[in-house]
Amino acid sequence: PPTLIIADIPGIIEGASDGKGLGFQFLRHVERTRALLHLVDVSLPDEDPVTQWRIIRDELASYGEGLEERDTLLVATKVESEESEKRAQALFEAAGLTDGLMISSVTGRGLEALRHRLFALTYPEVSDF
């Protein structure tokens, strides 16, 4: 069966494409990826998930190397309340998605769907995972 290699790149912050923090170092790692999985925490009432998503998209575009054109799966995480579900819907609407994926590690919500979507994104030629 096909396998996935997943690299967690947590250090992309606003200004990363200008070298802020460990920006270049992390963005060089992203260059080697086949696809991007963008996890956005929607549980925090004081954080705007749309802004967080846009910051990362802008940094990828500013860095260049075609990163903003990579196949990307946008996932709302920590969706465990009605409020977080509303924030997830706003995120997907801003991203122009009709099929955004909501997950929760606590409840297990959407985890199997995430696995399927990751394999489909990475191995589009394989139909059964």
Give the role of each language-model region.
Residues P1-A16, A35, D41-V42:
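Switch I (G2) and immediately adjacent beta-strands of P-loop GTPase domains
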Residues G19-G23, S84-R87:
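Amphipathic coiled-coil/heptad-repeat helices and related helical stalk/stem segments
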Residues I13, S17, L27, S43-E47, ...:
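A short glycine-/small-residue-rich loop at the edge of a beta-strand within enzyme catalytic domains
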Residues G21-L44, L60-L67:
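Inter-motif core of Ras-like GTPase G domains
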Residues T3-I6, G23, W53:
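A general structural signal for well-ordered alpha-helical packing
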Residues P45-F129:
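C-terminal-of-GTPase-core extension/linker across diverse P-loop GTPases
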Residues I5-I6, L36-L39, L73, L101-S104:
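Structured core elements
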